[in-house]
Amino acid sequence: MREIVHIQAGQCGNQIGAKFWEVISDEHGIDPSGTYSGDSDLQLERVDVFYNEATGGRYVPRAILMDLEPGTMDSVRAGPFGQLFRPDNFVFGQTGAGNNWAKGHYTEGAELIDAVLDVLRKEAEGCDCLQGFQITHSLGGGTGSGMGTLLISKIREEYPDRIMETFSVFPSPKVSDTVVEPYNATLSVHQLVENADEVQVIDNEALYDICFRTLKLTTPTYGDLNHLVSAAMSGVTCSLRFPGQLNSDLRKLAVNLIPFPRLHFFMYGFAPLTSRGSQQYRALTVPELTQQMFDAKNMMCTSDPRHGRYLTACAMFRGRMSTKEVDEQMLNVQNKNSSYFVEWIPHNTKSSVCDIPPLGLKMAVTFVGNSTAIQEMFKRVSDQFTAMFRRKAFLHWYTGEGMDEMEFTEAESNMNDLVSEYQQYQDATAEEEGEFEEEEGDVEA
């Protein structure tokens, strides 16, 4: 019941995805060959959210791996859990998108997309009651951003009533891999605003900061970063997979976190994060977890929640704890920091409690927040976009694939609208309700 089909697109998506399956397989006691070697019935009770049981008791992930070049796929296949995936579910081209959004969305990607959709339909048909899709991709490259958003819009057409959740790695302010990142990211956001239900915003710089500051790693690798992301990803779906006192799922998350349809970009965090050396010096209590998860240093994207206000927030606790204590703590945070929560949504935090903690921890919490501070992220990308677009730099790579300059202008204005919408709700107070409703009508139109 309540299955989720997982899709990983492009190099970044496949690397995060591979790490995610390692984490999930560990939680469910499934070894790299797909056989169950755990010790608790709870691990198998709802293993079918992410796994399909094949013949001979083998568990196969409901995962689709796609890329426009074979390189990353080969390394996933050669990786520790590479033999877990169904061989037919590797869909790849040979050319590569060359960091070009237009190639991923219009030319190369469009040729490969039907093959991906066929595999997707097979997976969806194998589901009892499909809850939705989760996609891991980056917005800076060509495949994850261009082809990823193409796939999202195709899935939207075919499964309009299913939840579409993406884990999107945004270009980071100081760490840039490619020159045309701002173009690719802006064009992608333009699509995500319209077609995705929830977008979890991640960026490498924030992850590096967490690794340096909190985990005290001297030379963090992408593996470490991806591990952070997958810990939080596993937390988002834990109540679907394990019994709990207070459940949440992707749809409940969406309903509780999205006050206006366009504002569905969430920042998220995970606690407890401690360096390996200092683990034994910390007591894990609900107050301590709550304290850390609301900490700005804990967010997986470079926007400071203290610069904006939370429209809504959601905390997914895992482990043995009293729900009373959880509720008290959440209320406590809201009362003490009331200026950081908008006043026109009275009880704007949701919490859920799941009994089974992640491996190696007694308690943990995943935090998802819808904060107006995320506009910093969009502003930053938008400024870089404008700087290049004003000079029409690198534009011929996109127009050469059949794109029109108009599309860039549209994407840019959509991004700027998004920023001003966040700003508008950040400044809104409970009193101006009357004039506000008229404005709201305009936004929708």
Curated annotation (Swiss-Prot):
Region: Disordered, residue numbers: 426-445
GO annotations of cellular component type: cytoplasm; microtubule
InterPro entries on file: Beta-tubulin_BS, Beta_tubulin, Tub_FtsZ_C, Tubulin, Tubulin/FtsZ-like_C, Tubulin/FtsZ_2-layer-sand-dom, Tubulin/FtsZ_GTPase_sf, Tubulin_C
Claim: Ribonucleoprotein is one of the keywords in the record: no
One GO biological process term: microtubule-based process
UniProt keyword list: Cytoplasm, Cytoskeleton, GTP-binding, Magnesium, Metal-binding, Microtubule, Nucleotide-binding
Location within or outside the cell: Cytoplasm, Cytoskeleton
SMART domains per the UniProt record, alphabetical: Tubulin, Tubulin_C
A GO term, aspect molecular function: metal ion binding
Binding site for Mg(2+): E69
Binding site for GTP: Q11, E69, S138, G142, T143, G144, N204, N226
Domain of life: Eukaryota
Cofactor list: Mg(2+)
SUPFAM superfamilies, alphabetized: Tubulin C-terminal domain-like, Tubulin nucleotide-binding domain-like
Main location: cytoplasm
Comp. bias regions, Acidic residues: 429-445
Transmembrane segments: none
PANTHER family found in the cross-reference section: TUBULIN
Record's subunit section: Dimer of alpha and beta chains. A typical microtubule is a hollow water-filled tube with an outer diameter of 25 nm and an inner diameter of 15 nM. Alpha-beta heterodimers associate head-to-tail to form protofilaments running lengthwise along the microtubule wall with the beta-tubulin subunit facing the microtubule plus end conferring a structural polarity. Microtubules usually have 13 protofilaments but different protofilament numbers can be found in some organisms and specialized cells. Interacts with DCX/apicortin; the interaction stabilizes microtubule assembly.
Job of this protein: Tubulin is the major constituent of microtubules, a cylinder consisting of laterally associated linear protofilaments composed of alpha- and beta-tubulin heterodimers. Microtubules grow by the addition of GTP-tubulin dimers to the microtubule end, where a stabilizing cap forms. Below the cap, tubulin dimers are in GDP-bound state, owing to GTPase activity of alpha-tubulin.
Entry's family note: Belongs to the tubulin family.
Entry protein name: Tubulin beta chain
Species whose genome carries this gene: Plasmodium falciparum
